[in-house]
Amino acid sequence: MNREITFFRRFEADILASRKTITIRDSSESDFRPGEILRVCRNEDGVFFCNILVKSVTPITLDALTERHAEQENMSLDELKKVIKDIYPGLEQFYVIEFTRC
């Protein structure tokens, strides 16, 4: 059985349309492996909405995020940093999980 990853409801449409192709997580969600298929569910209610294939998992700091990361998240760099700070207040070390729908 595939492991699961959750996303806030506000990201569902972008994931389904392949506009969001990465997720940035803290160390507690950094153990996914390239080639692994994950069930994707909404964080708020646990409803399944697709599967994704993990392409890569790369460590990164908040300050090292670029416009390319923001583009892969389908938002501006300022928006991306704000979202990350809201979800993970006080953290600086993260992991970029690149994925594709499958």
Swiss-Prot record:
Swiss-Prot/TrEMBL keywords: Hydrolase
Superkingdom field: Bacteria
Reaction(s) catalysed (UniProt annotation): N(4)-acetylcytidine + H2O = cytidine + acetate + H(+); N(4)-acetyl-2'-deoxycytidine + H2O = 2'-deoxycytidine + acetate + H(+); N(4)-acetylcytosine + H2O = cytosine + acetate + H(+)
Entry EC number(s): 3.5.1.135
UniProt xrefs under Gene3D superfamilies: Hypothetical protein
Pfam families: ASCH (PF04266)
InterPro entries named in the record: AC4CH, ASCH_domain, PUA-like_sf
Record bears the keyword Hydrolase: yes
Entry-linked CDD domains: ASCH_yqfb_like
All copies of domain ASCH, residue ranges: 6-98
Catalytic residue positions: K20, T23, E73
A cellular component annotation (GO) from this entry: cytosol
Any one GO MF annotation of this record: hydrolase activity, acting on carbon-nitrogen (but not peptide) bonds, in linear amidines
PANTHER family the UniProt entry points to: UCP029143 FAMILY PROTEIN
Similarity comment: Belongs to the N(4)-acetylcytidine amidohydrolase family.
Function: Catalyzes the hydrolysis of N(4)-acetylcytidine (ac4C).
Protein name as it appears in the record: N(4)-acetylcytidine amidohydrolase
Lineage, top ranks: Bacteria, Pseudomonadati, Pseudomonadota, Gammaproteobacteria, Enterobacterales
